[in-house]
Amino acid sequence: MLAVGLAAQAQTPIWDTSGNSNLNGIYYFRQVFYFLGDASGDLGEATAIYGNIKFDGNGGYTLTQSTTQPWVYYDSYYGGYTANQTGTYSISASGYGFISSPNPRYPGDYIYGLVSQQGIFVGSSTENTNGYNDMFVAAPLASPMPTAANFSGTYVFSDLDLVGAAQGQPAGMLSMMFTLTADGACHFGTTTVTGYAGTTTTPYTQISTLPTCSFSNGAAVVTFPTNGLLTQGQKYLYFSKDGNFVFGGSPYTGYNPWDMIVGVKVSSGTPNFSDLYYQAGIDELGGYLDTFYGSLDLPALHPQTIMEHQRIEDLFYTPAATDSTYLDSYTLTSGATYSTSLARYAVGAGGAIRIGSGIGPNLGLSVALQAPTLTPTGVFLNPQGIVNAASWAPFTAGIAPGELLTFSNSSNLAADTVVATSPFPTSLDQVQVSIGGLPAPIYYVSPTQISVIVPYAVTGPIADIQVTNNGVLSNTVPVYVNQTSPGVFTQTSNGLGYGATEHNADGSIVTAANPAVIGETVAVYVTGLGAVSPTIADGAPGPTSTLSEVPAGSVTAYIGSATIAPVQATVVYAGLAPALSGLYQIDITIPAGLTAGDNYLYISGPDAYNSQSLIPISTATSAAETPAVAPVPTLGKQPPGRLKVDPKAKRAPSPRGGGGTPKQ
């Protein structure tokens, strides 16, 4: 067992609490925990906590109890007992924040996550050091409480049954989807459950005729037959205020008390699946677990493209949480569903909610909920608009020292549009930016957008960002600080399509007509690689004589296609781009074993990963060349702003494999 004792009390993180009122009132909640038991990734223990939680709107909560829906802590190793009765929370203006854990064994841990437009909180304790993965969901209870009459229409559910918690084996895990058509009187008729078990790739089907359900204190109790192949026994289902989102799981007296269920009400027609969403989920991939929270963005001008961020706790491979930013794609069917190589998804509630279920052997469950729309006042720094200037990955991704950031979709940040010259100043057109209490070098300012460099001395785990315009302060925005947060600049300046990559031999741009060749060295332009040596002043250009490099071995690069697993490329150089401010350069040698055409470029640091950009490859071999830092590019001289063009990459892989065919 990795962790069986009580955790030490941790210090509460410093966080913006201006959004605490976003959690207010009585909620239903469910939290599931999974503990690794051995070096093979087998489960040693599982826990479920569920019931009612009352948020006071001011940073405190109490677990409330009734005779029929008590708050319950049930552990596969220790048995059942009650959870913590009180706790605290901090929620920022964007809905991003944390809740102290109700798990009595780990009172010092925090559940990080986000509050959606619907007031639903989803998250995970990604920063815990006690050896577990978890997922937490809380939704406000409607008043009056839901009854059978509210359970009407068609609902699609995703269910992750971790029966392996009792068996100690991932092979016992089940990932499934099913549809319930309710008539408002707790009648469902026949339902078909399809899913996957363990490491198999063959789907299973279970056809069940459900009896009538019952309601207790606003929760539905639905019972599946006890001989079900995929799911069986009682399920407690909790409803959001509008009835469009449903979640829950088995009671502690049930067949498998450690499952998690999420569901969405669907209707005919194509939903408006667009803009920003907050997400959380569980993955059981090939014998090991990870859990995550984060966000995903569907840019309006880039149809069928999803830019995703996940803050992942992956205990089997990395004991500390990591950031992953990547692309995905989708084509909604007439039933508002779509599939990738890793998961099946259903979109409902008019496009406001997406649920996901894994495809074997990649089992899992996820939920994404539409983010709140923020109302600007005064000098307004939009928390949802703070992004990596290269990748434009969603705002929940952490920042890194030396990273070039862009603040977008804000208001009254500056009087005019002004672009600085290198070295970048810390004051431009009467505008200053503070990150972690340190002045940040400014690339450009405009009324709605600013680009800055994170000072090298900024430390974490959390830093506040604030803008001052002519003496007037903006709101403060808390962000995570990583060692690295890599983002690849692209030729379209929007984080999509071909990466900003040059042939080392002549400095020409790598394009489909001028592809990279097996064996040659190319230069990739990125930001967010963190600390360098020798150090330089904030905002200064990279030196051209003694080059400033990142720590040896801290950056890795892989290249792969939809049909070829990623192949590691040799990193010849990784450090600041000579003569440019805010840009890093990675020189990589194109490895053998790739397929001709568009390939995905994977760049990772010790705590963050990016796989958004493409690199075109020719399978011809190049003459041997002497690796060297490429000539100074002109890429850093592009005007500020995000170019509005269609993405070149319609599909990129999940950070954990899979993927479709890249298209041009």
Range-by-range predicted roles:
Residues 1-7, 314, 439, 569:
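Short intrinsically disordered, low-complexity coil segments enriched in acidic
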Residues 1-11, 661-664:
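Sec-dependent, cleavable N-terminal signal peptides
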Residues 5, 15, 116, 348, ...:
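N-terminal non-cleavable signal-anchor helices
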Residues 9-380:
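Mature soluble binding/inhibitory domains
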Residues 35-41, 164-171, 175, 185, ...:
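A sequence-level detector for low-complexity, Ser/Thr- and acidic-rich stretches
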